[in-house]
Amino acid sequence: MNTADVPDNLQSWGQQPSSSYSNTQQHSQMTNLPPINHNNLCDTEPMNEDFQLQDVQADELQKQQKQQEQQHIQQQNAQRFIAQSRQPHSNILRFPQPPITSIKTNSHAFYPQQEVTQVRPKKHRVSMTNAEAALTPGMPPEKQAAKKRNIGQFSTDTVPAGIGMIGIPFESTSKPLQIQQFRNPQDAPVRKLTSDLIKTYKAINESFYLRKQVRRDRHKSQDAGKPKGSKDGSGASLTDTFSIHNAIPITSSDNHYQQDAHQNAPPLLDTNAPPTSTMVVPMRTETDLQQQQRQKSSRGGPYNNGYDDQNYDYILKNGEIFDKRYVILSDTPVGKGSFGQVTKAYDTLNKEEVAIKIIKNKKTFFDQAQIEIHLLELTNAHDKDNKYNIVTLKGHFVHRAHLCLVFELLSYNLYDLLKNTSFRGVSLNLARKFAQQLGKTLLFLSSPELSIIHCDLKPENVLLVNAKRSQIRVIDFGSSCQTGHRIYQYIQSRFYRSPEVLLGIAYDTKIDMWSLGCILVEMHTGEPLFAGSSEVDQMMKIVEVLGMPPKEMLDIGPKTHKYFDKTEDGIYYCKKTRDGYRHTYKAPGARKLHEILGVTSGGPGGRRLGEPGHSVEDYSKFKDLIKRMLQFDPKQRISPYYVVRHPFLKQKEERVPSQPPVSHSNLQQQQQLYIQQPSSQMSQVMESPSVGSVYVEDNGMYRQAPGSSANPISVTSSFDEGDAMEVDAGRRRFSAHQQNYHNPNYQYSQPQQQQQQQYQQTQRTQLEQQQKQAQLQQQLQQQQMQQQQQQQQQRQHMPQAQSSSQQHLQSRARPRQQDQNEWRNQFELDDTFQQKQRKVDDSVSNQISRNQFNPQQVSMTHGNVNANNREMEKLDYPNNKL
């Protein structure tokens, strides 16, 4: 019999505290065995002594062993029964297991009629196992040592369950020793059940304790007779169930990134623990739902100690005080967005109502709000008088981890205004007022000292100061950036997204000009101009109206392949979508802007026919402005400087601002050169609408002169420092009258005669266009008059002669209009034209020096030539030298 099969307590039975040699000798005497030779542990001899004394001792030991076994079985069965009785109230994993009917050897319980594989660590100074003994008889000591090293530290014996107790002879049924064979961890019942069922039981326990906590809170609130929770809104502690069983305190204060509790949870059952009669409840960590429930307070929010909701927005309470001065006036916000929410408050120090923008309690929104604060402080510092229609930032602070921005309180936005009109649009006069203010705003933002890109210009971000007036403010600089510090590629709302952003090309302040053009059309028509449902649909809607984008943009666009395909010849065409909806779109440019605006039909849908301020002339100017704003190429797109001087926006009683604020230090670093006032003998160089052509101005609208060449014109300008500057007139041009002064230092190298011919030819072309527009308007008026006359005749039965006489008078008025136009053409071709021009220039220069020049508009309807406008046109003539 191998001593390794004897239980540890039996091996140590009868031993006294002495040396190892004496213990071995006493053991040999007790079992009537020869002493163990420590020099050769593999030597074994048969027992030939009487077993009478040993049998008596073995019987007593067997009785004690059975008693201990029964006690151990009772304790474990009791422990299992207690665990099963606490099944709904604990996180202890349960698994089916038969009652224990065998002893515990090396912390493994053997079941009846079941063979198990025992793994024991190698013990020193004891006899070898049966397998080892079978390998060593007759071997020299050297081979035995080598074989012993090959066996390793572990050995396995397969024995029948229930056998192995002392006094029961048996023959080993073990197979030959298999070296380094370990038990598969997946066969272990505890580990297998833990890995498979931990998620299931975790979810069951979370749901159970959550419902239990809700019921307990409901009972507490009913017993107290008031709403649950305290007034301070601090996180309520867990119930007694959590406080008893949760022995690990929660120290993490991060409410945004919670970890799963089972990742750091201790083992639920310790199979190697000694038997005990006391039930040990294992320690548990809080799960996500339990932690949220622990933090829930009377305010109803699971985050930020109950002050936030699930979207990380602050939970507003009427009467709450922010920053010791702002009193919240409502529980509901006046506006919400991806950034957070806006609420109405009362400033107790300044005795006024304000709007507080509460940013979400997330790091990304917090960082972006800091950029918004920086840009607003920069704009407010350069616009202290608030002339450029940007919302005023009154202050900012942090309240319970939320960054709060305090603004002036404003009224409705432009989208609300459209809803009030049932999406029929506002009048052209009101759209003109909005365009004037927004043009000044973009002129201010694009100045060299700021170079701010709003990046989210839309009707929702343009608010009225007063509901009864047309004054506006531009808000929401949360997505804004500066030209040299672009952060995002995915910007702008889809309806107002520019082509360069859709194509992934680098963008600048011109993207806001595209958005402004879309806004103006929507404000008048009542519907978005490009209402795309996706980026692909958005690009196709743009192509329907404006045609295909320039090839130069498509060649460099990283996202061009998303919208267009390319032939072998390098020609782009619209890409067929996955759904096969290519035929639902019209051909490029088939949807005319002329028809959308209703230039000749009395506005969109004919709703403005006959109304004052909605003539064909007004719509023609409006269409020209929109076309310049909606140019594909940002370089060809009209700049804010020209927008505020466009004939659609210029009014007789208004004076156009001279120039945006600028410093001379960064003058040459910008795309547009802003030159200072005449005191420094400098002028302004602006970009022309296109490259390689000579353009002249017609009431603020720049048209290509017939027969103009693409050769650049060398222009020289004198400075105080004596520096000379050569400007390519193919891309830039001098515009003296737009600065309200004339600089006599310009010297043009092109012959005067050629320029004068170009100027005269341009004037003829302009007059022809004006005549056509006037004739169209007269025809519409005549049609209206005829309809009115027919109605009157039907009601009053007037004689036919009266209507014919009226038609005769109207027919006589038409040649009179033509005579006036012919007189104007003859006047411009008069031989004394240059003499009159010099006289006018002298008078205008005197007005310019006194800053009293105010250009007037040309009345195209009646064909009258205004003298002041004529003076303005002559100032644009480059041959004038005062």
Swiss-Prot record:
Principal cellular location given in the protein's record: nucleus
Residue spans of biased composition, Low complexity class: 64-79, 290-308, 747-761, 789-810
Basic and acidic residues biased stretches: 220-231, 816-827
Tissue specificity as recorded in UniProt: Expressed in all somatic cells.
Subcellular location: Nucleus
Segments of skewed composition (Polar residues): 1-42, 843-869
Gene3D superfamilies per UniProt: Phosphorylase Kinase, domain 1, Transferase(Phosphotransferase) domain 1
EC primary class: transferase
Chain residues that bind ATP: V334, G335, K336, G337, S338, F339, G340, Q341, V342, K357
Region (Disordered): 1-45, 62-81, 212-239, 255-308, 742-761, 789-882
Family: Belongs to the protein kinase superfamily. CMGC Ser/Thr protein kinase family. MNB/DYRK subfamily.
Name of the protein in its database record: Dual specificity tyrosine-phosphorylation-regulated kinase mbk-1
